[in-house]
């Protein structure tokens, strides 16, 4: 595999293991030329799924968009890249299990919100503010109150 740092094709696998959900193989690699290490993920090729946008347009499903959105929401939060990768894998698995060749952006958003709520509540509020298009401070307060109620319900 080509090194992303120096472009050399001389790399070797140091460690290889399945992801927690078993949908991918995570490989830790080292470049023999520059000595830098990097991680790759090997996944099986899936049947194409189309995302139905709010305006009715359709585009090919792109797991990277989900991952990048979650990375942005988790910026400066104690959430690892691996945790985000596993969450994206769970979202993709749920979508596959639903078995549809088309999925609305609303459904993807719901799944992302569920995963973020479990990972980090601050990241959840960040994404909710964009996803639900918050316009007023009261909308932030309401979602924080909702999280507090859920937490109190779990403690009882």
UniProtKB/Swiss-Prot annotation:
One of its GO terms (molecular function) is zinc ion binding. Belongs to the NrdR family. Keywords: ATP-binding, DNA-binding, Metal-binding, Nucleotide-binding, Repressor, Transcription, Transcription regulation, Zinc, Zinc-finger. Negatively regulates transcription of bacterial ribonucleotide reductase nrd genes and operons by binding to NrdR-boxes. A zinc finger (unnamed) spans 3-34. It comes from the Bacteria. One of its GO terms (biological process) is negative regulation of DNA-templated transcription. The lineage of its organism: Bacteria, Thermotogati, Thermotogota, Thermotogae, Thermotogales. Binds 1 zinc ion. This is Transcriptional repressor NrdR. The keyword Calcium does not apply. The keyword tRNA processing does not apply. Residues 49-139 form the ATP-cone domain. It holds the Pfam family ATP-cone. Its cofactor is Zn(2+).
């Amino acid at each position: 595999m080509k090194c992303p740092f120096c472009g050399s094709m001389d790399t070797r696998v140091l460690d290889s293991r399945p992801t927690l959900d078993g949908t991918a193989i995570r490989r830790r690699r080292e470049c023999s030329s520059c000595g830098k290490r990097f991680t790759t993920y090997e996944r099986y090729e899936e049947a194409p799924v189309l995302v139905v946008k709010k305006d009715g347009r359709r585009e090919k499903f792109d797991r990277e968009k989900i991952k990048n959105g979650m990375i942005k929401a988790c910026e400066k939060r104690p959430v690892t890249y691996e945790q985000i990768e596993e969450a994206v894998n769970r979202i993709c698995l749920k979508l596959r299990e639903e078995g549809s060749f088309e999925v609305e952006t609303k459904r993807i958003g719901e799944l992302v919100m569920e995963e973020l709520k479990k990972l980090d509540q601050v990241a959840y509020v960040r994404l909710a503010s964009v996803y639900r298009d918050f316009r007023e401070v009261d909308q932030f307060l309401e979602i924080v109150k909702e999280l507090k109620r859920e937490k109190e319900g779990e403690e009882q």
